[in-house]
C-alpha cells in the first residue's frame, strides 16, 4: 500500500511540474507589411503560445502588442520596440505616410503603449524606441531558463513570416 501511495504521489508530482508548451521568440524583426503581421499574429493568438520579445521588434512587428493578450507577452533586457507612422509607396515611388493605417496601428496598441507614444509626439515617420526600464515596467520579464533556442532569420529586403522565430521551452 505504501508503494502504491508513493507511486501515485510521484505520478502526481511529475504531472504537476508545468507542461512544456510552445514559445515564440521575437528578435531582430524589423517589420514589414501590416497585413502579413496581422494574419501571423491572429494565428499566434489562437495558438495560445507565449511570446518572448528578446531583441528588436519594430514597425509592423509591434502589432504583436495588440494582437496577443498582455499576460502572454514577456520582455528580456535586450527587448526593443520600434514605432513609426505607417506608410505606402506614393505615385513617384517614394514613401508617403498613410494616416488611416497609422491610426489603425495606434489604436491596436495597449493604452500604456499609446500613452508612451503620445508623450513623445505620436507616430511620425521617425522611429521611436521603447526599451529598458520603461518597457520592463509595461510587460513582465522573461525567464530565460525557458531554454528557447533561436534560429537567425534570413535577410530579405522585406521581412517575411519566417522572421518570427519559434522555439520550445518552459516558462516558470
Show the residue positions of the predicted features.
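N-terminal secretory signal peptides that target proteins for export/translocation
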Residues: 1-2
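Cleft-lining beta-strand/loop regions that shape enzyme active-site pockets
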Residues: 23-91
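Bacterial N-terminal signal peptides
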Residues: 6-15
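Charged, glycine-interspersed solvent-exposed loop segments at helix/strand-loop junctions
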Residues: 23-26, 35, 39-52, 91-172
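Generic macromolecular interface patches on structured domains
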Residues: 7, 74-75, 145
Amino acid at each position: 500500500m505504501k508503494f502504491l501511495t508513493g507511486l501515485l504521489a510521484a505520478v502526481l508530482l511529475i504531472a504537476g511540474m508545468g507542461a512544456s508548451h510552445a514559445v515564440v521568440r521575437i528578435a531582430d524583426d524589423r517589420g514589414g507589411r501590416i497585413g502579413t503581421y496581422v494574419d501571423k499574429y491572429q494565428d499566434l493568438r489562437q495558438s495560445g503560445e507565449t511570446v518572448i520579445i528578446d531583441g528588436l521588434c519594430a514597425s509592423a512587428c509591434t502589432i504583436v502588442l495588440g494582437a496577443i493578450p498582455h499576460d502572454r507577452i514577456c520582455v528580456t533586457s535586450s527587448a526593443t520596440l520600434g514605432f513609426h507612422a505607417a506608410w505606402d509607396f506614393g505615385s513617384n515611388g517614394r514613401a508617403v505616410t498613410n494616416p488611416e493605417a497609422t491610426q489603425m496601428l495606434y489604436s491596436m496598441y495597449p493604452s500604456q503603449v499609446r500613452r508612451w507614444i503620445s508623450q513623445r509626439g505620436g507616430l511620425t515617420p521617425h522611429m521611436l524606441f521603447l526599451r529598458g526600464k520603461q518597457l520592463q515596467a509595461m510587460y513582465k520579464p522573461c525567464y530565460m531558463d525557458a531554454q528557447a533556442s533561436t534560429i537567425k532569420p534570413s535577410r530579405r529586403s522585406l521581412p517575411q513570416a519566417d522572421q518570427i522565430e519559434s522555439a520550445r521551452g518552459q516558462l516558470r
